[in-house]
From Swiss-Prot:
Function summary: One of the essential components for the initiation of protein synthesis. Stabilizes the binding of IF-2 and IF-3 on the 30S subunit to which N-formylmethionyl-tRNA(fMet) subsequently binds. Helps modulate mRNA selection, yielding the 30S pre-initiation complex (PIC). Upon addition of the 50S ribosomal subunit IF-1, IF-2 and IF-3 are released leaving the mature 70S translation initiation complex.
Similarity remark: Belongs to the IF-1 family.
InterPro entries linked: NA-bd_OB-fold, RNA-binding_domain_S1_IF1, S1_domain, TIF_IF1
Protein's UniProt name: Translation initiation factor IF-1
Location of this chain's protein in the cell: Cytoplasm
Domain S1-like as annotated: residue spans: 1-72
Database matches in SMART domains: S1
Pfam families: eIF-1a
Main location: cytoplasm
Any one annotated GO CC term: cytosol
Organism placement in taxonomy: Bacteria, Pseudomonadati, Pseudomonadota, Alphaproteobacteria, Hyphomonadales
Keywords for the protein's UniProt record, in alphabetical order: Cytoplasm, Initiation factor, Protein biosynthesis, RNA-binding, rRNA-binding
Amino acid sequence: MSKEELIEFEGTVVELLPNATFRVKLENDHEIIAHTAGKMRKNRIRVLTGDKVMVEMTPYDLTKGRITYRFK
C-alpha cells in the first residue's frame, strides 16, 4: 500500500491494552484500536494513557490504526 492512501487523524490514548496495543479516541469521537509503529518501538518511545498521538489508518479498515507520533 502506498503512503498516499493512508488517512491520518489526531487522537488521545484512552486505555492501554496487551501487546503494545491501545484504545484511541479520535477527534471525531470514534474509538479505534491502534498499535505502535515499528520505529516508535525501536526508539523506545513510551505511550501512556492521556497522551495525544497521531494515528494513520487505511481506508479499508477504519477500526484499526497505527500510532506514528506522540505529541509532547
